[in-house]
Amino acid sequence: MVDDSTRKTLSNIPLLQIRAGPREKDVWVQRLKEEYQALIKYVENNKQSGSDWFRLESNKEGTKWFGKCWYMHNLLKYEFEVEFDIPVTYPTTAPEIALPELDGKTAKMYRGGKICLTDHFKPLWARNVPKFGIAHAMALGLAPWLAVEIPDLIEKGIITYKEK
């Protein structure tokens, strides 16, 4: 189910230990520390391999995340706002990643611009609770979704390149 490239990417993202969500206030701080460490490592790895593709930050509580992601297609950079909330049942429930500006532009998306991850990602996440975190959701959820959907949306003329 997972190709060699994805397997290599995954093996370089630290696995998380602490099983805590936003409701467990004291332990959640420790889980957030693990989340940030894994995200930092993932971004560093991406930069070293020349595949840097997102920036994220969170609110003070670590329950709302937002930032930008981008996809390179034919040497043009397509940039999108990305956002998600950490579910109260996290890490049992994976975050639902949204690209609001693409809402309604593809069938592989739910209302509000939430990307469809049910078939491939959610079963994998469920088998790896609490080891997977936000970095894993980006690597196994958003990255493959962008790789499949963005070129298709570009070819259909649904999204176009915007000069900056």
UniProtKB/Swiss-Prot annotation:
In Gene Ontology terms, what is a biological process of this protein?
A: protein K69-linked ufmylation
User: InterPro entries from the xrefs?
Assistant: UBQ-conjugating_enzyme/RWD, Ufc1
GO terms (molecular function) for this protein are: UFM1 conjugating enzyme activity
Keyword list (alphabetical) reads: Ubl conjugation pathway
GO CC, sorted alphabetically, is: cytoplasm
Where along the chain is the active site annotated? Answer: C116 (glycyl thioester intermediate)
> Record's Gene3D superfamilies?
Ubiquitin Conjugating Enzyme (3.10.110.10)
Name the coiled-coil region(s). Answer: none
- The cysteines joined by S-S bonds are none
What this chain does, per the entry, is described as: E2-like enzyme which forms an intermediate with UFM1 via a thioester linkage.
Query: PANTHER family of this UniProt entry?
Result: UBIQUITIN-FOLD MODIFIER-CONJUGATING ENZYME 1 (PTHR12921:SF0)
Family the UniProt entry places it in: Belongs to the ubiquitin-conjugating enzyme family. UFC1 subfamily.
The name of this protein is: Ubiquitin-fold modifier-conjugating enzyme 1
